[in-house]
Amino acid sequence: MSKSNSKDTKVKAIAVFCGKIKGTVIFTQNKEGIVEIELNLSGLKKNHSHGFHIHEYGDMSDSCESMCAHFNPYGKSHGGPNDSQRHIGDLGNIETDGNGNAKYIFKDSSIKLTGTKCNIIGRGLVIHADTDDLGRGNDPTSKITGNAGKRIACAVIGYARP
């Protein structure tokens, strides 16, 4: 990553999914610290919502399982991306079209590509089989995982070429 003194410099990161589920997720942090998340994914279940989270580690030694829990540096309960009570890694759900593709952009003000506490570089990005209930379920697991189900695809988030 090249460094610049310009306040207009944007920091970019990428996660590349290979396998049955393919594509990229590009993260771009602007000078205000807001991160734009651009999805370009295929091979997902058609017309479905898949739980989508940043996990603690970018460790793929045991596929997606070694990425451990959701990234949660403040020790909060699971929630939705717009909730004040949420893991930093709680990005909500990926919405797919009739072909199983997800191609759109959304923003998040909690994750960061710089600094230390909320920095997601080197962490795991996981797509789950089921819909994330955003911590609103009636069982204890809802406040931990959102009942998003099995991990069906994962990638490591790394700095992107400028």
What is each stretch, according to the model?
Residues 1-162:
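N-terminal leader/targeting pre-sequences
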